[in-house]
Every structure is written in structure tokens, then in C-alpha cells.
């Protein structure tokens, strides 16, 4: 009986994850016992399990932090925020996938299984409290990401992207584990994060050369997951070759999970080397902001452009991680990440819809879309403007708060480069918007001329447009109500 109560006590800390596991089991059972006509049940179960997980997480929001499973998992306010963000990403991505899966005749069950399992791995990663659990959760997320990126097996580009993703992902995980091994040895054989810190203090190794090796190795491993320059080589190919709903999912969840990991590892274990990891992240953020935005200008593929744009966006988020020592630092990072989820997924919703109706991803082929589908063109324009940071959209207020916190924390170089690169990003976003709104027949390509006109431009007719409406509304209005969001983040964290 005592063991049963202990199981209930510890299991309560991962109740949202348990709901996802139950949803996965139900998906498998229904797939084995029913025919293909019951496909709506697959989406219903997936969405229901995600929504229930969010609900349980919100109900447990005010509970005291707790370490369970012999120190393997920590339920803290910080982990709850990032687990919520991952669940939110996953919930918004499923409606994006419904029409795509139907049109491309992809296997539904496996797709949803991999997506939910990746979300599960990301949630466990956000609360993992020891080096082994971190690695297992990270690999759970990564392996599902590899499988999702290569889901269209008959597509040569998808196979090529998956192979690059798998090889480079495996190499980065090896480097990350190499850094963990240094921490394990220097701390005297500890794996729990706080015990690693205590072990480094007891062995007087917190300022040794080995710590610098561990720091660099872990930064390289996490930099790959965040698509930081120069560990970004996989990103454009995976974005271009993978199914668009998969790219939408990976573009946000991987950054949320890796940001949570980076924040906990650097701020806790490398507390005594704060100057070193601040400098290292500053260099990576500057490179990402500059190269990401400059190379994005030259792209002709919409998804490749967003791949390079995402490198610049994660550079902005790094400012919040570096400024995380202050009360506003983490709050600014979380606030901008919330805005980025809606801005990015809204953009991808428009790309999925356009791709299904035209079969192209070339930026030039978007010319004149406003004449055929004003709703999609207007939605894409708003999301791109928000990504660029145009007032009064959410992206502007998120970046403004992020840069202000970075300036307050003394990251003057980062904050000087950030707005400049943001202005450059506005250039290539506006170039796309100009194409969208053109009415010159000479510029309109056959793809748009043959575009299947919607019966009504401003009424949602499918799940993609429903997701689009949610994301566009959030991208335009959340900046106006940013103060309550910041207050919730600060109150939760501190």
C-alpha cells in the first residue's frame, strides 16, 4: 500500500505526460481494431489528449515545486511554462496536418504517434533533473523528429533531408553526451543537476579546464537543436524537404525544448562560469542574427527563407537567456517565444494551404495571391509583418521588451545588432508581401492564375484555415495585452 501511495504521489507530477501516453495507447488500439473510415477518431483522440494535458497542467499551475522519481524529474514553475508551450505547439499543429495528410495520402496513425511522442519527449526534457533523463528525453524527441522529417518516403528531397538530419543529429548528441561525461567525472560521479553543482564545489573543479571543455561540448550539442550558426547546416535542407506540417511542428517545438534545456544547464551547472557561457552564447547569437537574416534575403524557396529567418529569431531569444539573471530576462524570453509560436505557425498555415492548392513553394509563385485568395494573402502578410517586428503587431512588442531586458542586463552589443537585423528581416518580408498584393497580370504566375478560388474568402472552411485564424488573431492582438502575459510569467517564475 505504501508503494502504491508513493506511485500516486510521484505519478501526479507527470500527470499531463501520462495523459499523452494514454492517448498514444488508444491510437494504437483503434488503429489495430478499426478500418480506415474511423480516421476522424485519430484526430479527436490526439487533440483531446493534448487539450486535457493542457487543462491538467493549468489546474496544477500553483502547486509547489517538487522533485520526484528519485531526483529524475522536477516539477517547477519554470518547467510548467515550457511544457505548456510544447503542448500549445502540438495542439495547433494537428489541425495544420489534417488536409495535408488527406491530400498526400500519408499514414495517419503513425504521423500522430510520432508527433505525440515527440511532444512527450519535449515535455519530459523540460522537467528532466538529471543528465541521463535529459539525454533519454532529448533522444525521444530527436528520433521522432527524424522519422517525421522523412515521412514522405517516396520524395527524394525528404530522404536526403532526413539522412542529413539523422547524421548531424547523431553527431551533435554524441558531442552533448561527451560534455555530460566531463560533468559526471568532474563532479565525482553525480548525475542529478543540483548534485553535479555541489560535486563541482566539493572537488574544487568548477573553474578547471575540464569545465570549459564540458561547456563548449554542451553548447555545440544544444546549438544544433536550436539551429544556431555555425551548427545550422541541416536546417535549410530539412525545412525544404520535409512535409510542411512537420516543418511547422519542428520549427517551434525544437526551439522551445532546447531553450528550456539551455536555460537550466547554463544557469544552474555553469553558474560559476557565467562570463564564459554568456560570451559563447553572445557570439552564437550574433552569428545567427547576421547570417540568418542576410542569407534569407537571397532565398527563392519560402520554406528555406523561413529556415534562415528562424536562425535570426532564435538569436533574439538568446538575448533573453543571457539576460535571465534579472527578473525580466526569462519573462521576456518566454513572452517572445509565445508570440513566435503563433507568428511562425500562422505563416506555415498559409504555406501549407498555398502548397496544397498550387503544388509549389517558390516565393515568386505567390505573386498576385491577393487577387485569388484575399484571406490567405492578408493572413500571411500579417504574420510576416509580425515576425519582422512592425508595430502594433505582437512581434514588435515582444522584440521591444526583449531588447529592453537585454540592454538592462548589459548586453549592449547584442541589443545594438538585434534591431538592425530586425530591420533587414523586414526587407525580405516586405518583398514577399509586395508580391502577394500585386495585381499586374505579367507578374502573376500560372500557379496563382489556376488557383482554386474559395467560395467565401473570410469564412473558415477547413482545419488549416481555422489554425490560421487563431494564429493570425494572436499575432496581431497579443501585443496589446502583453502586460498581463509578462505579469503571469514573472509571477510564475519568481
Swiss-Prot record:
Tell me yes or no: is Translocase among this UniProt entry's keywords. Answer: yes
GO annotation, cellular component aspect: chloroplast thylakoid membrane
> Where is the protein found, in the record's own terms?
Plastid, Chloroplast thylakoid membrane
Carries keyword Thylakoid?
Answer: yes
Q: What is its EC number?
A: 7.1.1.-
Q: Mind listing the GO biological process terms from this record?
A: ATP synthesis coupled electron transport; photosynthesis, light reaction
Any stretches that span the bilayer, and where are they? 6-26, 39-59, 81-101, 106-126, 131-151, 166-186, 211-231, 277-297, 305-325, 336-356, 377-397, 413-433, 468-488
Q: Which family does it belong to?
A: Belongs to the complex I subunit 2 family.
Its job = NDH shuttles electrons from NAD(P)H:plastoquinone, via FMN and iron-sulfur (Fe-S) centers, to quinones in the photosynthetic chain and possibly in a chloroplast respiratory chain. The immediate electron acceptor for the enzyme in this species is believed to be plastoquinone. Couples the redox reaction to proton translocation, and thus conserves the redox energy in a proton gradient.
Name of the protein described by the UniProt record? NAD(P)H-quinone oxidoreductase subunit 2 A, chloroplastic
Organism for this UniProt entry:
Cycas taitungensis (Prince sago)
Q: Which gene encodes it?
A: ndhB1
